[in-house]
A protein has these predicted regions:
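Intrinsic-disorder/low-complexity coil detector
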Residues: 23, 84-87, 109
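Negatively charged, low-complexity tracts enriched in Asp/Glu with abundant Ser/Thr
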Residues: 1-63
Length: 128
């Protein structure tokens, strides 16, 4: 990735990926903590992906939290519904696993699983 303003472009790629996988909504990205630099092989970053309708009205029921980090040299994305802490969490590393948010054990995917799995795949493509 070759950007002049890397942080802004990186956030834009995440937002556009969410726009694509969660149509017809529009998304913005707010960094919560961590860093990711173009030339750095390490990543540890948490962002919120905020959702709006086409008229700009916030739709917080669709907001997401995205964590990106390396585990054993492999990129891992963890995606959860920001305002629904009891919903399953997507772990997308070498394998894709849905986890119960209360106990961390593997669980069945929710009905909206394909959207979040597609989002994770698109973001991984941009990063790797």
């Amino acid at each position: 990735m070759f950007f002049e303003d890397f942080d802004e472009k990186f956030n834009t790629l995440i937002a556009k990926s969410a726009d694509f996988t969660h149509k017809p909504f529009l998304h913005s990205v707010v960094k919560i903590n961590g860093e990711y630099e173009r030339d750095n092989v390490d990543i540890d970053l948490t962002v919120n992906i905020l959702c709006r309708d086409n008229e700009g009205k916030r739709l917080d029921i669709y907001d997401l939290e995205l964590e990106l980090f390396k585990s054993n040299s492999e990129l891992v994305l963890v995606i959860s519904k920001l305002n629904f802490p009891d919903e399953p969490i997507l772990w997308s590393g070498v394998k894709t696993i849905w986890m119960n948010s209360s106990n961390g054990k593997k669980c069945s995917p929710p009905k909206y699983s394909s959207r979040l799995e597609n989002l994770a795949t698109r973001i991984k493509i941009f990063i790797t």
